[in-house]
Swiss-Prot record:
This is Membrane progestin receptor gamma. One of its GO terms (cellular component) is plasma membrane. The gene is Paqr5. Residues 73-81, 135-141, 208-253, 316-330 are extracellular. It comes from Mus musculus. Non-classical progesterone receptors involved in extranuclear signaling are classified in 2 groups: the class II progestin and adipoQ receptor (PAQR) family (also called mPRs) (PAQR5, PAQR6, PAQR7, PAQR8 and PAQR9) and the b5-like heme/steroid-binding protein family (also called MAPRs) (PGRMC1, PGRMC2, NENF and CYB5D2).
Length: 330
């Protein structure tokens, strides 16, 4: 009878420092795991297991939402719905990339970095998908067709490219300058999100009368609140920082961060769908829908330059002497 032996787990002092997580003492996988061992760890309680499943299960939920939208949309003729489909597609990409990164990050030191480079690229692709949907459906009435509106997606593309580069670069500082590393990585994700959210800020704070007439704004507010909560968990490393070893398997900050991010995406999707439906007639009469070349160009530029960043920093891993990258300065 065929039987599979689950991989052995290790303590924090048994794995290289590049694999250490603040406040997590047990449940580490072998730092040179095979791909098979990584996949088997999906069904073993490690300190990464729930990190994987908290994005892998929602991935299938978002795929279902995307496929349902495809089924009811006349893709060829309904150009008004194209930005929504692009957004929903990118909402499937980032949870899958995150799950894969957490699954295979224990194959080697360099594999760990490359996995997260790809994860950062996927997050930024989702950021661009959000910007495209916001541009199409959520802009305040007073700013539709303004210069800001015309430049909004182009600058969102630039933001994703810079953000991918900055977040990848931050990994090279992870051991030598951990505080700077965390600061740069938070900044890398915060400023594209802030740019993407400017239309929502306008509607909330500068055009409150318009906001009160649109029920989508309640979902936008909930989305922002959940995103702030996700940012807190990502930055603070709570609760495990207060009780090292107590939350190694269940309840540590990265798991809570994943849950908050997924809930934020769900709320954001509901808000955009409501804006798309409630404002359809006005937007079609007032603004021009995105053309296919515009959407394709934005997505391709993001993908090409983000992949270029990932390839550049991945190659740099093999050019930098190992002690400089993987050992802490003394």
């Amino acid at each position: 009878m065929l039987s599979l032996k689950l991989p052995r787990l290790f303590r924090i002092d048994q794995v290289p420092q590049v694999f250490h997580e603040q406040g997590i003492l047990f449940g580490y996988r072998h730092p040179q795991s095979s791909a098979t061992a990584c996949i088997l760890s999906l069904f073993q309680m490690t300190n990464e297991t729930l990190n994987i499943w908290t994005h892998l299960l929602p991935f299938w939920f978002f795929v279902w939402r995307f496929m349902t939208a495809l089924y009811v949309t006349d893709i060829q003729n309904d150009s008004y719905s194209w930005p929504m489909l692009v957004y929903m597609c990118t909402s499937c990409v980032y949870p899958l990339a995150s799950s894969c990164a957490h699954t295979f990050s224990s194959m080697s030191k360099n594999a760990r970095h490359i996995c997260y480079f790809l994860d950062y690229g996927a997050v930024n692709l989702f950021s661009l998908g959000s910007a495209i949907a916001y541009s199409a459906y959520t802009f305040p009435d007073a700013l539709v067709c303004s210069t800001f509106h015309e430049c909004y997606v182009a600058l969102a593309v630039l933001n994703t490219i810079l953000s991918t580069g900055l977040s990848c670069y931050s990994r090279f500082l992870e051991l030598q300058k951990p505080r700077l590393c965390k600061l740069l990585r938070v900044l890398a994700f915060a400023y594209p999100y802030t740019w993407d959210s400017l239309p929502i800020f306008y509607r909330l704070f500068l055009f409150p009368g318009e906001s009160s007439r649109n029920e989508a704004m309640l979902y936008h507010q909930k989305h922002m609140g959940m995103t702030l909560l996700a940012s807190f968990f990502y930055s603070a490393h709570l609760p495990e920082r207060l009780a090292p070893g107590r939350f190694d398997y269940i309840g540590h900050s990265h798991q809570l961060f994943h849950v908050c991010v997924i809930l934020a995406t769900h709320l954001q999707m509901e808000a955009i769908l409501l804006d798309k439906t409630l404002r359809r007639e006005w937007l079609l009469a007032t603004s021009r829908p995105f053309s296919f070349p515009q959407i394709a160009a934005a997505m391709l530029l993001c993908i090409i330059f983000s992949l270029s960043n990932i390839i550049y920093f991945s190659a740099a891993l093999y050019r930098i002497p190992e002690p400089e990258l993987h050992e802490k300065e003394t």
